[in-house]
């Protein structure tokens, strides 16, 4: 027994080394069971948790903006993404490979505050401080429409998920507007008392939901042309709104340093706030920090002024990730439509794309 133990002793530290070298050979395509042992040779190069996405590396840095980056969104097909900000440019990037910036959309005379792809990804909508909303062909990069009518900064825009291509906008002029991109002027306008910082549609696109500096979230009925109900609870300006993919719940981010989930189904109880999340912060910069849902609704993410990316578990309300790396406020975090990947846009002029388990 003693001799056996002695014999085993020095072998133990050598085993992993041998196995690693063997797998490298298999990864290169030699050996009988090459395909079984190793799917991707690249997975051996990283010394960390196993890879869970098709990104070239677990974290990719996207640099090219010349000013603060306010917004970022993945294309619905997941192969490209768009980002925009203070430099008045919209940059289009490849998600896979070297993440090259393959196109730049120009034409704004003010910062780009928010952007969204429509459901099929054929169009990109963007809102700007030059008081306009632009509609771009996401394939060619051409601007196909410019919507004018607001008298101050347009802080937010959101395209309808289904039906005719409608888009809603919210502005510092205190109005929420509804546009049909086939028409020149807004087809409906709702007058709010204070600046509107964030807007979205409900799932059926017959209501617009808005948030602003009066701390309230308002739901406007497009058929009856009036305010339907108001959701109160935030103690400071609401800077971001996002509807869950199945359309039942609304996520809001506000300067009171809370992120909330609201039940926006018809006939929901009067107290619609169902969850409160804490962990992200706003600061004196008063940037419009946005928020987003993962495609399956199991996670939420929000921008934060403490230079970290916050991702929560929706059910337990636990912070799953507080990711460092940026040198400025994180203004938006977006989830990839298919893979466990997030992208963050920051005031440090950079974007980080990384995989999360």
Curated annotation (Swiss-Prot):
Keyword Ubl conjugation carried by entry: yes
GO biological process entries: mRNA processing; RNA splicing
Record localization: Nucleus
Gene3D superfamilies linked: YVTN repeat-like/Quinoprotein amine dehydrogenase
Protein's UniProt keywords contain Nucleus: yes
GO cellular component terms listed in the entry, alphabetical order: catalytic step 2 spliceosome
Pfam families named among the record's database cross-references: WD40
MF terms in GO: RNA binding
Keywords noted in UniProt: Isopeptide bond, Methylation, mRNA processing, mRNA splicing, Nucleus, Repeat, Spliceosome, Ubl conjugation, WD repeat
Record-listed Asymmetric dimethylarginine modification sites: 21
WD repeat segments: 64-103, 107-146, 149-189, 191-230, 233-272, 283-322, 325-357
Main subcellular localisation: nucleus
Residue(s) of cross-link: Glycyl lysine isopeptide (Lys-Gly) (interchain with G-Cter in SUMO2): 18, 270
Subunit relationships: Component of the pre-catalytic and catalytic spliceosome complexes. Component of the postcatalytic spliceosome P complex. Part of the U5 snRNP complex. Interacts with PRPF8. Component of the U4/U6-U5 tri-snRNP complex composed of the U4, U6 and U5 snRNAs and at least PRPF3, PRPF4, PRPF6, PRPF8, PRPF31, SNRNP200, TXNL4A, WDR57, SNRNP40, DDX23, CD2BP2, PPIH, SNU13, EFTUD2, SART1 and USP39. Component of the minor spliceosome, which splices U12-type introns.
Functional summary from the UniProt entry: Required for pre-mRNA splicing as component of the activated spliceosome. Component of the U5 small nuclear ribonucleoprotein (snRNP) complex and the U4/U6-U5 tri-snRNP complex, building blocks of the spliceosome. As a component of the minor spliceosome, involved in the splicing of U12-type introns in pre-mRNAs.
Protein name according to UniProt: U5 small nuclear ribonucleoprotein 40 kDa protein
């Amino acid at each position: 027994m003693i001799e056996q133990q002695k014999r085993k002793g020095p072998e133990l530290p050598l085993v992993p080394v041998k196995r690693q070298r063997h797998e490298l050979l298999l990864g290169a395509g030699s050996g009988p069971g090459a395909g079984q042992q190793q799917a991707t040779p690249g997975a051996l190069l990283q010394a960390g948790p196993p890879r869970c996405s098709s990104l070239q590396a677990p974290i990719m840095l996207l640099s090219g903006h010349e000013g603060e980056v306010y917004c970022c969104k993945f294309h619905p097909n997941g192969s490209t993404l768009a980002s925009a900000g203070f430099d008045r440019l919209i940059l289009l990037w490849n998600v896979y490979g070297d993440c090259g910036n393959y196109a730049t959309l120009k034409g704004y005379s003010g910062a780009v505050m928010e952007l969204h792809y429509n459901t099929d990804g054929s169009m990109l909508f963007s809102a700007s401080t030059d008081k306009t909303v632009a509609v771009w062909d996401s394939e060619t990069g051409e601007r196909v429409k410019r919507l004018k009518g607001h008298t101050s900064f347009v802080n937010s825009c959101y395209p309808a998920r289904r039906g005719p291509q409608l888009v809603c906008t919210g502005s510092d002029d205190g109005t929420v507007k509804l546009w049909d991109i086939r028409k020149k002027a807004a087809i409906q306008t709702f007058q709010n008392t204070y600046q509107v910082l964030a807007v979205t549609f409900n799932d059926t696109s017959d209501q617009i939901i808005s948030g602003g500096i009066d701390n309230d979230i308002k739901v406007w009925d497009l058929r009856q042309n009036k305010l339907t109900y108001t959701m109160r609870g935030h103690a400071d300006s609401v800077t971001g709104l996002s509807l869950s993919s199945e359309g039942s719940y609304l996520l809001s981010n506000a300067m009171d340093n809370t992120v909330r989930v609201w039940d926006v189904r018809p006939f929901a109880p009067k107290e619609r706030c169902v969850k409160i999340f804490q962990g992200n912060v706003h600061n004196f910069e008063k940037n419009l920090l946005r928020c987003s849902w993962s495609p399956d609704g199991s996670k939420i993410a929000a921008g934060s002024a403490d230079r970290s990316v916050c991702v929560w578990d929706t059910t337990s309300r636990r912070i799953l990730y507080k990711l460092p790396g940026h040198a400025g406020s994180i203004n938006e975090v977006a989830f990839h439509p298919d893979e466990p990947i997030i992208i963050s846009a920051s005031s440090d002029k950079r974007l980080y794309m990384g995989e999360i388990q």
